[in-house]
Amino acid sequence: GSVRSLSKTEKILADISKHIDPKGNLEFCELDLLKEEGWNEAMKGCEYVLHVASPFINKEPKDENLYIKPAVEGTQRALRAAKKAGIKRMVLTSSMVSMLGDADKSTVLNQSTWTNISSKNVSAYAKSKTLAEKSAWKFIEDQDKETPLELAVINPGPVFGPTLSGDLSGASMGMFRDLIQGKMPMLPQASINMSDVRDIAKIHVLALENKAANGQRFIVGTEKAYSFQEMAQILKSNGYEKVSTKVAPNFLLMLMSNFNRDLKSMRDFIGKTYDADVSPAMKTFNWKP
């Protein structure tokens, strides 16, 4: 596995060891999405690659290139090194946010839909995932076909489920934490497709060797997009009394998003519902959401 700093490996191994014994099955190397060093060496002796790294925080960055540059350049570095090393297949973690169309109306996401990065409603994160994934497919299309590198792409929604360490500070889990602690006094009129981290991990592994996965995009998450109101009601009915069920008007959220970076990062979803066609993943991997 790759990390940005080898100083993190001790904690990672400790967290993994709570669940399985990783000895002899896990090695670490230090890689940076924005630097060339180490990529070719990291791929030596490998047959398959999972490229899951991409920067994300809940706030919209002042400069969208803080997301876009490492997402695109990191993907290209991984692909070039994989091709040079003779890797059989790469499985790339993209996102449902690369499938939003114009992000200006509710729609059903599927394998053929792409986010229009020119739309004013598209966040920097959505742009970064869209551009990174498109650059990957372009690389595959343009490569030397004599010994082709295969590609499969996984497109999850916001990721929930158990963490290795028990830490709930991640972007998606942090949203539920804020709901439970009453730190979200008014709810946005927005809906999200939820992805279980265990499903995502399983599909990534299955996509490595499943012949039918080559050249495909797979949405891994719920077919139905759940509104914040629905999530709040579920939490409320399960005893979380601090959860607010008050709804903020869309016009107010969109207006405030021009000045608030937390809200601006949600513009893709405010006032819209994106249901998803997960049938390709269900059929290919015999999987149920």
State what each model feature region is.
Residues 6-8, 17-73:
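NAD(P)H-binding glycine-rich loop region in Rossmannoid oxidoreductase-like domains
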Residues 1, 209, 240-246, 262-289:
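C-terminal amphipathic/interface module of NAD(P)-dependent oxidoreductases
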Residues 203-263:
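Mid/C-terminal beta-alpha module of Rossmann-like enzyme folds, strongest
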Residues 161, 187-190, 218-226, 236, ...:
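Glycine-rich Rossmann NAD(P)(H)-binding loop
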Residues 51, 55, 60-125, 144:
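Conserved Rossmann-fold NAD(P)-dependent oxidoreductase catalytic core, especially the SDR/UDP-sugar
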Residues 145-147, 161-174, 207-218:
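Glycine/proline-rich active-site loop of Rossmann-fold NAD(P)-dependent oxidoreductases
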Residues 176-185, 190-218, 223:
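Alpha-helical substrate-binding/gating segment
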Residues 119-151:
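Active-site Tyr-X1-5-Lys
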